[in-house]
Amino acid sequence: MKTKLYLITNDFPFGKGENSFILPELSFLVKDFEVTIISTSLSEDRTADVDAEIKVIHYDRKEKLLRKLLDCASYLGHKACYKEMLDIFRSGGNVFGKLFESVLFYEEAKRFERYLRKNRIIDDNNSCVVYSYWYTFYCLTMTEYFKNKENIKLITRAHRYDLYDEGSRFGRQPFKKYMNNRMDYIVFIAEHGRQYFYQKYGRERKKEQYQLFRLGVEKPDPIVTGRHSNKFLMASCSLAISRKRIELIIEGLSQLSNERIRWVHFGDGPELNSIKQYADKLLGNKHNIEYEWMGYVDSNEIIKFYQKSEVDLFITTSASEGCPVSLQEAMSCGIPVIGTAVAEIPYMIEGNGILLDENPTGKDVAEAISYIYDLKTEERMQMRKRSLELWDERFNLDKNADAFLNFLRRVSTEG
């Protein structure tokens, strides 16, 4: 008989944000577990099909205002909240903002716990694994609901917005210290995140309770038809938002005079129009540079483009990242890469491209592009080979998912 596993998600199988991450993992989980998905999505639009054997529960977040206010008031009566408030006041900065965020976090956790209890969603009389895909308020619910239940293993993944203080509106992650001491395992998708968390919260626990299991991407089919022009083809893929610093790519290209380059950017976002205008201003009169805005494109289509067009270089100049999937996808296609030394990117660029400083200048970007451009054929092929090797070692989805499944098997049998 399979062990029950409850997977708590932000959206999946509703909305679009998690499909590409969770669908591949599910195909491994169902091999050994009886899976129930508890989605907390606000969307009613179901966008992913799952096996008939997987039960899907769509959490109804609706609650009366009075009940919400009572939950907020109960914050003052919880022992953990006194420690939380003390930590907030010691942290300085926008204390009232941090306190406000903490109270809302607590209220959401209480509301979710009440829903689980009322509807008897989780069978806590038998051994099971409760697996949260994000390290957020569900985890506070889990630590309260299953307090002192040794037959239930509590596991969460930790990504970026749910891990780093900078991902929080007021520069502090609510209840992390409290939840840390009560989760059985925290699974990080990036080594940088694991080190960050351990230094900040983890000294009281064994390192084994902080596991690294990267997500990864699938290996594309080997379809390469050759380049479409004699120009060096460079690609980038990101949302058009300030922390992605697409303007640095533009500034770098503007300083190149002899290199014949075609740059394509995949992705849209709120700042795309202003970025386009900036590109027109700096690159519009440069006859050696072509650029094209592809807008939002499904990741499968992006990979097909990489394969068919024989992309020479992938570049990201982001100021902040987790473990960027866009970079993993480029590596899986054997593309040399340029990236900034933030978060997990230093673990992704080792002999397969150029690692820029955390805050590079346009000149730094130009020099890195020029270096890759000038590589001899043999050197470029060596970089391509190294990108594939690193992808296979660290970001191969099948290998990573299988390793994570083995971990869950072991955890589910622990006493």
Briefly describe each language-model feature range.
Residues 351-362, 371-377:
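Conserved acidic donor-binding segment of nucleotide-sugar-dependent glycosyltransferases
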Residues 55, 156, 177-222:
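Donor nucleotide-sugar binding/catalytic pocket of nucleotide-sugar-dependent glycosyltransferases
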